[in-house]
């Protein structure tokens, strides 16, 4: 009987070791999920060149403003209005007269900027994207067909193709202790060197109403974040 119990205990320990090893392997795979290649379809943004040569999407954040100024100079006058020095708006886009738009900014074809939207600058709004009532954008790239339609804050963030933020969900971009943001995945850590870092959303991500994405949040493709969550941990694809 004693031998049987000891043997069972050893089996349990072995299983725990095996499970722990599997978890570590999964964590390493998850970290790869947060690269640009695994998060984003670069064919679904006018800002494709901004991401070239980089590994993680947050690496583009310090360069968005300068990139817009360079890219804007290359846009067709037949397709884009240029109402001020650092603002380009596609002629097919719909912009409410009550929207506040500060450059540098590019608003893509068929995009919609609704009543009282506030674009603070350094923003790229993709084709067919929606920036809604009282939504605020700052230093952000919205890929094509992104929707931030109701009372959202999107600062220092990248939102992948067809991602959607429910009403009142926000990207918190500064830690309360004002320290630099670190992306964590299990025991793995990546020092970003950034004080302001909102969220990185992969393609086809759904964020539920009223959720808060804390600084350094990275969400893999096709993930669903439930409503009213305070969310920090990275999410692998399809979770």
Positions of predicted regions on the chain:
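Flexible, glycine/small-residue-enriched loop-and-beta-strand segment within the central core
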Residues: 72, 101-107, 113-207, 211-213
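Extended, small-residue-rich solenoid/repeat segments and analogous flexible loops
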Residues: 42-118, 122
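Short, intrinsically disordered, charge-balanced linker/junction segments flanking boundaries
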Residues: 2, 25-28, 223, 230
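Short, small-hydrophobic-rich alpha-helical interface motif
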Residues: 10-12, 93, 111, 163
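C-terminal segments of enzyme domains that contribute to small-molecule binding surfaces
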Residues: 34-62, 71, 175-224, 230-233, ...
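Short, Lys/Arg-enriched N-terminal segments with co-localized hydrophobic residues
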Residues: 9, 14-29
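Single conserved hydrophobic/aromatic residue that forms the stacking wall/gate
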Residues: 1-14, 231-239
